[in-house]
Amino acid sequence: MTLYSKPGCPQCKVLKMKMDKAGVAYNHIEDEDAIIALGVKAAPALVVEGAIYTGPDAIKWFTAWAKERANGN
């Protein structure tokens, strides 16, 4: 799992905090150019096994994934 964020991005901060709280191992790249290189314009960008989730969808996806993980699924 790789989190791409940019400085000053409130949604990026929220997602990073959720990922840290869940104790998930992930790579964090804080670089707006790296986000653009992915072909997306929104931050945060969360890359999971080739799928890219961006903006609020990244937070929603991670929240649901973390909940399933906590329930043993």
How would you name each of these model-derived features?
Residues 1-28:
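Local sequence-structure signature of Cys/Sec-based thiol-disulfide redox active-site neighborhoods
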Residues 2, 45-48:
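A near-ubiquitous, low-amplitude feature marking generic local secondary-structure context
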Residues 14-18, 43, 58-62:
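Non-catalytic interaction surface on structured domains
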Residues 31:
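Active-site loop/turn elements of alpha/beta-hydrolase fold enzymes
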Residues 34-36:
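Amphipathic, hydrophobic secondary-structure cores in small proteins
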Residues 38-46:
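Structural micro-motif
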Residues 47-73:
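Non-catalytic, surface beta->alpha helical segment in thiol-disulfide oxidoreductase systems
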